[in-house]
């Protein structure tokens, strides 16, 4: 398996961990961060699929087989699903990653579709596999788009805490009022894929509201990430990182 390069994070509270980087199947890239209680490695599988590695535990978010051969990946201690759409909920990937003791948290609507897992309501923090997980709302607001991710379906974004590091993975959402209560976070993954999620302008506005130290646009499809970089160019408090998360 090819080796991948580590990225250097901000020097203050979010400094990257120097040194050895893991190799991941398919040459998937990762960034590593000091949490104050060990390192967190975030692996970018593609689109909305991520892996968090912390304290010997493996957390998968929206694993989808298109973005990895999961027979070659470590088994999951925890799986988080944001909602029921096929580019986020993949029974084949879940089966490949599951072992005895794997826990899976997801919205009730997605749990009904899949037929298993634990429904996690918004605002209910849970400690699992060394992570603290908080589900938060994710939905569309623009007329004509609300059928994609309706508010009353109660899809999830997640705020994940590892050590002293807080990471917001927004799921499929537009800029919503509840984002004002998400921060402070160190890292944010915000979707940018009109008409399903946010425009670059909405993503920039969400970033200014949440104020992450590092922003990863994800789920961005064919959206021009240069537009987001330009919109946030004058905001020196937010570092925008572009990864292979189309």
Regions found by a protein language model. Give the residues of each.
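Active-site metal-binding motif and surrounding structural segment of the metallo-beta-lactamase
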Residues: 65-112, 183-189
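Binuclear metal-ion centers of metallo-dependent hydrolases, dominated by the metallo-beta-lactamase
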Residues: 118-132, 152, 204, 208-246
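Divalent metal-coordination and catalytic microenvironments
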Residues: 52, 83, 90, 133, ...
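Active-site environment of divalent metal-dependent phosphoester hydrolases
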Residues: 67-69, 85-89, 111-114, 124-127, ...
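Metallo-beta-lactamase
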Residues: 159-210, 217-223
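Positively charged n-region of N-terminal signal peptides that target proteins for export
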Residues: 1-5
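Bacterial N-terminal signal peptides
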Residues: 7-19
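Core dinuclear metal-dependent hydrolase active-site scaffold
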Residues: 22-74, 117-183, 243-246
């Amino acid at each position: 398996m090819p080796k991948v390069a580590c990225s250097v994070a901000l020097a203050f509270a979010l400094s990257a961990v120097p040194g050895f980087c893991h190799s991941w199947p398919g040459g998937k890239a990762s960034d590593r961060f000091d949490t104050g209680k060990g390192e967190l490695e975030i692996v970018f599988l593609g689109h909305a699929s991520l892996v968090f590695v912390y304290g010997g535990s493996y957390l998968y978010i929206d694993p989808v087989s298109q973005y990895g051969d999961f027979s070659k990946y470590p088994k999951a201690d925890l799986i988080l699903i944001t909602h029921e759409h096929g580019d986020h909920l993949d029974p084949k990937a879940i089966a490949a990653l599951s072992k005895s003791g794997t826990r899976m948290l997801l919205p009730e609507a997605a749990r009904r579709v899949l037929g298993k897992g634990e429904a996690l309501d918004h605002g209910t923090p849970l400690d699992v596999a060394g992570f603290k997980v908080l589900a938060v709302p994710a939905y569309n607001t623009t007329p004509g788009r609300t059928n994609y991710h309706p508010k009353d379906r109660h899809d999830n974004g997640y705020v994940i805490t590892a050590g002293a590091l807080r990471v917001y993975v927004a799921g499929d959402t537009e800029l919503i009022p509840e984002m004002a209560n998400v921060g402070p976070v160190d890292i944010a993954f915000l979707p940018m894929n009109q008409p399903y999620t946010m425009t670059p302008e909405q993503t920039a506005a969400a970033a200014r509201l949440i104020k992450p130290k590092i922003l990863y646009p994800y789920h961005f499809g064919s959206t021009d990430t240069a537009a987001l970089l330009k919109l946030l160019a004058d905001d020196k408090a937010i570092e925008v990182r572009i990864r292979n998360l189309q």
